């Protein structure tokens, strides 16, 4: 849904990857019954720039790659950058490696991760992306052209 020219909001992310299955400890109560939360209400923004899309996430509970792949599929544009949470704090080594490989495969220009990535994983992602990595925190200004 376009909220402003060049800015769309997305939700109901497809579960495309086999390694991002969500946290089994989050539940929602529907009609008095608890069930696994699939985070269908989670949103992410897509900003159109000259070369493609910059994705802005909250916490990425559905999985950062599920979010990216869904937005890429819907927009039919290159994902140039990511700003926000990745929810990789609980990711095991296999999932983290697969996520890094997937991000490298789409050839992002920058990744500005923040909360819920985890301190150890921040270092691993920083080492994987070098100058493309930005540690994003409150008050940062990121110039997107």
Predicted features and spans:
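Cap/insert and terminal regions of metallo-dependent hydrolase folds
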Residues: 38-44, 48-55, 59-138
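Short, intrinsically disordered/low-complexity patches at protein termini
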Residues: 28, 33-34, 79-80, 135-136, ...
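Active-site-proximal loop/helix segment associated with metal-binding centers of metalloenzymes
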Residues: 2-50
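Short secondary-structure boundary/hinge segments and terminal tails
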Residues: 20, 90, 121, 143-144
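Non-globular, low-confidence helical/coil segments that flank catalytic cores
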Residues: 1-5, 130-145
């Amino acid at each position: 849904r376009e909220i402003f020219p060049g800015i769309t909001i997305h939700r109901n992310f497809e579960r495309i990857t086999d390694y991002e299955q969500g946290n089994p400890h989050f539940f929602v109560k529907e009609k008095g019954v608890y069930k696994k939360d699939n985070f269908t209400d989670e949103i992410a923004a897509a900003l159109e720039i000259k070369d493609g899309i910059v994705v802005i996430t909250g916490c990425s509970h559905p999985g950062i790659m599920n979010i990216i792949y869904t937005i890429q599929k819907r927009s039919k544009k290159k994902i140039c950058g990511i700003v926000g949470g990745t929810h990789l704090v609980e990711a095991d080594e296999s999932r983290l490696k697969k996520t890094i490989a997937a991000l490298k495969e789409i050839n992002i220009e920058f990744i500005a991760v923040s909360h819920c990535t985890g301190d150890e994983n921040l270092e691993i992602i920083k080492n994987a992306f070098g100058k493309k990595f930005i540690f994003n925190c409150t008050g940062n200004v990121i110039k997107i052209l």
